[in-house]
A protein has these predicted regions:
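Short, small-residue-biased leader/transition segments that mark boundaries at the very start
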Residues: 2-6
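Alpha-helical scaffolding within the catalytic cores
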Residues: 33-45, 66-73
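Short, surface-exposed basic-aromatic patches at helix termini and helix-loop junctions that form
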Residues: 46-48, 71-80, 103-105
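Loop/turn elements at helix/coil->beta-strand transitions in domains of secreted/extracellular proteins
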Residues: 49-54, 78-83, 109
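Short acidic, S/G/P-rich loop/turn micro-motifs used as interaction or catalytic elements
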Residues: 59-64, 91
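Histidine/acidic-residue-rich catalytic or RNA/ligand-binding cores of hydrolases
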Residues: 65-71, 93-104
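Short acidic/histidine-rich active-site segments
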Residues: 80-95
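Caspase-like cysteine protease fold
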Residues: 97-179
Length: 185
């Protein structure tokens, strides 16, 4: 309840100002425009997109066999995008599309990540070997291949301070048939 909020406020030394909402002119402008701000393919032609990796979760945005596919505008446009993830045809909207995405922050390559969450509709357009600098030095990207069946190694990662690494460890153990649901309960 509210008592818990006050306890946490005191524990973390948060002032009342921390909880105040500050309103700006930009907020009013954004609300006034509502859904009228639309990014079109023409906008993407000249957009120098800066993200190195773009994930698109909608139907047909990765339809590389048709003109006007959005992932192509990122890859072949004037920006710095190296890889995109898009869907070639209709895709189920009830998928957990961001499952394990945190592994990208641990140096896992885009293609390795995509392999873990692959669907028939989804594709990597661009460089599947692209990876981000890991938040801390590790060999996770290599270990996913070279230590795939090493149950002891993956069990050791269940104690990782990173939830994403723990999730990967569970996935690797499950795929290898080295852990049961009973062990987790």
């Amino acid at each position: 309840g509210l008592g818990d909020v006050y306890k946490r406020q005191e524990k973390y030394h948060l002032t009342d100002a921390f909880f105040e909402t500050k309103k700006t002119e930009a907020d009013d402008d954004t609300k006034a425009k509502g859904d009228q701000t639309i990014v079109s393919l023409e906008d993407l032609e000249t957009l120098a997109a800066q993200p190195r990796f773009v994930m698109l979760n909608a139907c047909y945005n990765g339809s590389f066999h048709k003109p006007g596919y959005i992932t192509g505008y990122y890859i072949f446009g004037p920006g710095r995008t190296v890889a995109t993830q898009g869907n070639t045809v209709n895709v189920l909207q009830d998928r957990w599309t961001y499952e394990l995405v945190g592994l990208l922050s641990h140096g896992v390559r885009v293609g390795q990540y995509n392999r873990l969450i692959a669907s028939l509709e989804g594709h990597i357009i661009g460089d599947p070997a692209f990876r981000f600098q890991p938040v801390e030095p590790n060999t996770l990207a290599t270990d996913m291949t070279t230590r795939k069946g090493d149950a002891a190694y993956w069990r050791s990662l269940l104690a990782s301070p990173w939830a994403d690494v723990q999730s990967l460890a569970l996935r690797m153990l499950t795929d290898a048939g080295a852990i049961s649901a009973g062990e987790l309960l």
